[in-house]
Regions:
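ATP-binding/phosphotransfer module of carbohydrate and carboxylate kinases, centering on a glycine-rich
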Residues: 1-16, 50-54, 116-167
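Glycine-rich phosphate-binding loop and adjoining helix at the ATP-binding site
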Residues: 1-78, 162-167
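Short secondary-structure boundary segments
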Residues: 22, 83-86, 154-155
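Glycine-rich nucleotide phosphate-binding loop and flanking beta-alpha elements
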Residues: 26, 88, 158
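Flexible, active-site-adjacent loop/turn segments at secondary-structure boundaries
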Residues: 29, 34-37, 109-114, 154
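Glycine/GP-enriched mid-protein hinge/lid loop-to-helix segment characteristic of carbohydrate kinases
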Residues: 47, 51-143
Length: 167
């Protein structure tokens, strides 16, 4: 990865900022709970700073997407974006009062850690009944965050019909 990045930077010397969007908890360059095992429990920011002079931003992938969602729908100052991939775990980015919310240790939005199901049950539900999993996660967001809008990006549900009569 570093070799490829250096090659790109050598070709285009106008690049001033590098932004890495990673599937995992990213806290000031330290990566935790990452889908990329080579990055897990490593301070990627410190590793890159030793080799690269450009400014480096490292953020969770769904948080980056939620910033884009907010810019598209900026009239919603309090929003959330849920990403439901076909594999692994669901994530969520949250915008509160127009700003990305990471939580104390950048763990906010890790819906895969909600106590409804263990990881094996979540994997099974993602394959067999992704609608149920998504509805529980949406209900949780509504009860805790109460966003004005929730964007949903799902790789497994083509026709999303959310039914939450209790909210």
């Amino acid at each position: 990865f570093l070799k490829m990045l250096k090659k790109v930077l050598k070709k285009d010397q106008e690049i001033a900022v590098i932004c890495l969007s990673l599937p995992g908890v990213c806290d000031q360059g330290m990566i935790d709970l990452c889908d990329f095992e080579d990055f897990q429990n490593k301070n990627i920011l410190e590793i890159l700073k030793k080799e690269i002079k450009q400014k480096i931003i490292i953020e969770n992938d769904v948080n980056c997407a939620s910033i884009g969602f907010y810019h598209q729908y900026s009239h919603y100052q309090n929003s959330a974006l849920i990403y439901q991939p076909a594999v692994d775990y669901v994530g969520c980015g949250m915008i509160i009062q127009g700003k990305l919310y990471n939580g104390f240790s950048h763990f906010a939005g890790e819906l895969r850690c909600l106590p409804f199901y263990n990881h094996l049950q979540q994997e099974r539900l993602l394959k067999d009944d992704p609608q149920e999993l998504l509805e529980k996660q949406i209900a949780t967001l509504c009860c805790v965050l109460n966003p004005e809008a929730i964007g949903i990006c799902s790789d497994v549900l083509k026709d999303i019909q959310i039914s939450l009569p209790f909210l």
